[in-house]
Curated annotation (Swiss-Prot):
Keyword terms, alphabetized: ATP-binding, Chaperone, Nucleotide-binding, Phosphoprotein, Stress response
Gene Ontology MF, one: ATP binding
Protein name, entry field: Chaperone protein DnaK
NCBIfam families: PRK00290.1, prok_dnaK
Gene3D superfamilies, alphabetized: 1.20.1270.10, 3.30.420.40, Actin, Chain A, domain 4, Substrate Binding Domain Of DNAk, Chain A, domain 1
Region forming the signal peptide: none
Residues bearing the modification Phosphothreonine: 174
SUPFAM superfamilies per UniProt: Actin-like ATPase domain, Heat shock protein 70kD (HSP70), C-terminal subdomain, Heat shock protein 70kD (HSP70), peptide-binding domain
PANTHER family for the chain: HEAT SHOCK PROTEIN 70KDA
Job description of the protein: Acts as a chaperone.
Gene designation: dnaK
Region: Disordered, residue numbers: 579-606
């Protein structure tokens, strides 16, 4: 049976893991790193870069480099490069395809199935977009699992006894907090809360804004209007944030960040940890409300939490750790790698699904309530948040006007009292209802949430017993045709990458052959005929011309290499024959001239 891998598709970094001997293991990427930056870039010559290569060139190619695309999943956001628009699903698929390809090279076998993690507070549209991204990348997503739940699996795999644990997950772009009960192989989520618009990126942005404001005051130049300068600022801000987790202050030096007239301008400032915490105080405060809500929903006080697990690189910030320690009265666990826990947990869940791990039961919950819009724009809940999944619930609705033959049902997800303040999942048209006074028809609407947290809805007219087929008119979701088209486009990118690699390898081989040919002429040119030397030089010049373009014709270059190799072979043959003749005086040499100087024209090479 082919391996099922676990993937943490992160805002800042992504990871892929698998089970080896019953233990989850991170798979390194082609660059040798366990973390793959969630960055995609399109070079001006049409090359696609993903991961570290894309991140390295971001400063010089800021307008064609995409990062933090996860923050746009489940929206109609588009990335425009040249004349083509890309959805968040397509960009995410490029990251997934990179992970898949590198893992296949590492494991030496094809990968077709994966468990992919998402923030616990992801909506239905965001979860569906993640599944679509997997499909475009050529992966069957066998399960969508919440990130805090995955981290809990990684923590609790070998733990004995019963524990109540809180997973505090502050990633690059999202924040989740989940409370679980674990014991005897059962991992049960009892409450979850979060904020999909809060993460490490926001902390970086506060540093950037501080630098921009200072520079504006001093020089009157807005650095946010320069994409390249802004990219440099964000990279410096991220580096400063990381350094301040272990240092009390850090230096930010950005030479030649702008020009004023003919004068270059620089940034050179010291950022202290105290100043950083002042700039980001309100962001830390934003983590408190979801934490309190999760505790309240679970019916627990902070003192009843046995262990606290930190997930996400942003939890390394001292201000986060200090708040947690103060609020819960205990130190968070240090034996879980915050960058890797989610991917490791996804690999464990993959092992459960694949039958490699037994005696583990995972019970997750829906993070948001589900319901419909009713008269007056009110949001009527049908499935409450933190309900264990999978789940199915039904409710009877009726018409609001006399003799209605159709109704529009607006399905929503959220916690607000009014429909307009919640997340719209789609509008369902149910027609064919027999005419009757208002309040008489009985329409049974059923909500199903599967193990992936994805919502399915059906409706049935109880009077006729006829079940109506309902289609979600949600423009954000991709159709099967769109997924198929995007999958084919992704394959074309893969084919283009293969061609590009072949061009580079062929060009390198040609350059090496040219170097060898020139060295051969230097060493032996005076020992062979001028005609042969000229032919070799002509072949060298021809090959040099063939490899001049940015995009070479591989077949033509290979032919040129073959011709040059053949000409070099004639030199080798000549030298071999000369050496043989020199070593045998009975064949064309006399003892009066040992080794005999070769004279042009003595040999004719056929």
């Amino acid at each position: 049976m082919a391996k099922i891998v676990g993937i943490d598709l992160g805002t800042t970094n992504s990871l892929i893991a698998y089970l080896e001997g019953g233990r989850p293991t991170i798979i390194p990427n082609a660059e040798g790193s366990r973390l793959t930056p969630s960055v995609v870039a399109f070079t001006k010559d049409g090359q696609l870069l993903v991961g570290e290569p894309a991140k390295r060139q971001a400063i010089v190619n800021a307008e064609r480099t995409i990062k933090s695309i996860k923050r746009h999943m489940g929206t109609n956001y588009k990335v425009k490069i040249d004349d083509k628009e890309y959805t968040p699903q397509e960009i995410s698929a490029m990251i997934l395809r990179k992970l898949k390809k590198d893992a296949e090279a590492y494991l030496g076998e094809p990968i077709e199935k994966a468990v992919i993690t998402v923030p616990a507070y992801f909506s239905d549209a965001q979860r569906q977009a993640t599944k679509d991204a997997g499909a475009i990348a050529g992966l069957e997503v066998v399960r969508i699992i919440n990130e805090p739940t995955a981290a809990a699996l990684a923590y609790g795999l070998d733990k004995e006894g019963h524990q109540k644990i809180l997973v505090f997950d502050l990633g690059g772009g999202t924040f989740d907090v989940s409370i679980l009960e674990i014991g005897e192989g059962v991992f049960e989520v009892i409450a979850t809360a979060g904020n999909n618009r809060l993460g490490g990126d926001d902390f970086d942005e506060r540093i950037v804004n501080w630098l921009v404001e200072m520079f504006m005051e001093e020089h009157g130049i807005n650095l946010k209007e320069d994409r390249t300068a802004l990219q440099r600022l964000f990279e410096a801000a991220e580096k400063a944030k990381i350094e301040l987790s272990s240092k009390l202050q850090t230096e930010i030096n950005l030479p030649f960040i702008a020009m004023k007239g003919n004068t270059p301008l620089h940034i050179s400032v010291t950022l202290t940890r105290a100043k950083f915490e002042e700039l980001t105080y309100d962001l830390v405060e934003k983590t408190k409300e979801p934490t309190e809500r999760a505790l309240k929903d679970a019916g627990l006080s902070p003192s009843q939490i046995d262990k606290i697990i930190l997930v996400g690189g942003a939890t390394r910030m001292p201000c986060i750790q200090e708040w947690i320690k103060k609020h819960f009265g205990k130190e968070p666990q240090r034996n879980v790698n915050p960058d890797e826990a989610v991917a490791l947990g996804a690999a464990i869940q993959a092992g459960v699904i694949g039958g490699e791990i037994r005696d583990i039961v995972l019970v997750d919950v829906t993070p948001l309530s589900l319901g419909i819009e009713t008269l007056g724009g009110v949001f009527t809940k049908i499935i409450e948040r933190n309900t264990p999944i999978p789940v199915s619930k039904s409710q009877i609705f009726t018409t609001a006007a006399d003799y209605q033959t159709s109704v529009e049902i607006h399905v929503l997800q959220g916690e607000r009292a009014l429909a307009k303040d919640n997340i719209s999942l789609g509008r369902f048209i149910l027609d064919g209802i027999p005419p009757a006074p208002r309040g008489v028809p009985q329409i049974e609407v059923t909500f199903d949430i599967d193990v992936n947290g994805i919502v399915h809805v059906s409706a049935r007219d109880k009077a006729t017993g006829r079940e109506q087929r309902i289609t979600i008119s949600n423009a954000i979701r991709l159709s099967e045709e769109e997924i198929k088209r995007m999958t084919e486009e992704a394959k074309r990118f893969e084919e283009e990458d293969r061609k590009r690699r072949e061009e580079i390898e062929t060009k390198n081989q040609a350059e090496h052959l040219i170097y060898t040919a020139r060295k051969t002429l230097k060493d032996y040119g005076d020992k062979v005929s001028k005609d042969l030397v000229q032919r070799v030089e002509d072949k060298i010049k021809n090959l040099e011309e063939l490899i001049k373009p940015e995009r070479i014709n591989v077949e033509q270059v290979k032919k040129g290499m073959e011709e040059l190799t053949q000409a070099l072979g004639e030199i080798g043959q000549f030298m071999y024959q000369s050496a043989s003749a020199a070593g045998n005086p009975g064949q064309g040499q006399t003892n009066e001239n040992p080794g005999g100087k070769t004279i042009d024209g003595d040999y004719k090479v056929n």
